């Protein structure tokens, strides 16, 4: 058995290590999976330089974030912490990664995407390039996507032009009209189910293929979070399909974001002093019921790391 703190809801969990699969719900409180917790841990490290639980994130409304069909398990909390909005490809608020609004280009500090890029219409390079264009010069894309270690990316459908899905009995077919006007019919489709419902798998990435897409789009640094982080229940038994952070440039806080963090830190300091100085806490400390040391040490660690 192992114990961990879910970095999405902040609750303590105790579970068997074998139950910590990439997709299986393993937090008894919010139902988060290893994939979700790994994604949010990567986001925390990329923005704050340390692994914080989502409830511990400072409220920095001057940082603008974009979600691509993010799960409500963390999307709702991100909206409380940042100037963040979640979008979808099939319902409002809609964002077409193949053709994003021009006014939004270069306006986001971070983009969060989990299991999206394997579903975008070909060519996939168009979606990666537009994600790059949506970010500010110092922005970061944090994503997960299924990928294999060796080989090349496998595109399931080449030459898609005018296409759609058709239900024939109990089968779903993809029907495409090519550039030459020929009709193609594809069977044996693979669908994944996520926040937006069923989504057609367009490709199977390889690690090298995914890295190449990101670097060709312009990202200067691509980091795969291959290390486990048991404290958050992020245990990677496989070496594939791990969280990835792709930086457009060196991330830095704006003056507004820095002010937001400092103001919150000052309020935290004040509240901690008032709490530690209360009569009941001081009495409990003297009687051995309350230990202030961990609180004070954690407070100092956060100050030094920032």
Task: Please report, for each region that a protein language model flagged, where it lies by residue.
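Conserved N-terminal segment of class I S-adenosyl-L-methionine
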Residues: 1-106, 110, 231-243, 253-273, ...
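Generic anion/oxyanion-binding catalytic loop in active/binding sites
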Residues: 97-100, 116, 199
């Amino acid at each position: 058995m192992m114990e961990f703190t879910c970095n999405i809801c902040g609750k303590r969990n105790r579970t068997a290590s074998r139950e910590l699969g990439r997709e299986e719900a393993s937090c008894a409180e919010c139902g988060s999976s290893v994939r979700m917790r790994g994604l949010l841990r990567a986001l925390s490290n990329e923005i704050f330089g340390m692994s914080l639980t989502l409830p511990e994130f400072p409220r920095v409304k001057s940082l603008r974030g974009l979600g691509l069909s993010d799960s409500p398990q963390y999307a709702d909390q991100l909206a409380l912490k940042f100037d963040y909005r979640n979008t979808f490809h099939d319902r409002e608020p809609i964002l077409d990664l193949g053709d994003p609004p021009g006014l939004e280009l270069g306006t986001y500090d971070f983009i969060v995407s989990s299991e999206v890029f394997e579903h975008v219409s070909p060519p996939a390079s168009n979606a990666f390039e537009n994600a790059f264009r949506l970010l500010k010069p110092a922005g970061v894309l944090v994503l997960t996507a299924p990928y294999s270690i060796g080989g090349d990316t496998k595109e399931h459908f080449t030459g898609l032009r005018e296409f759609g899905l058709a239900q024939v009995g109990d089968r779903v077919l993809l029907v495409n009209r090519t550039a030459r006007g020929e009709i193609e019919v594809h069977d044996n489709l693979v669908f994944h189910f996520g926040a937006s419902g069923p989504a057609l798998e367009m490709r199977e990435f390889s690690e090298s293929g995914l890295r190449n897409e990101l670097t060709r789009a312009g990202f200067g640094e691509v980091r795969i979070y291959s290390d486990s982080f048991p404290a958050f229940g992020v245990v990677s038994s496989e070496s594939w399909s791990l969280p990835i952070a792709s930086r457009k440039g060196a991330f830095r806080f704006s003056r507004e974001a820095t002010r937001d963090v400092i103001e919150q830190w000052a309020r935290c300091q004040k509240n901690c002093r008032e709490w530690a100085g209360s009569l009941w806490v001081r009495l409990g400390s003297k009687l051995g019921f309350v230990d202030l040391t961990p609180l004070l040490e954690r407070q100092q660690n956060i100050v030094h790391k920032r």
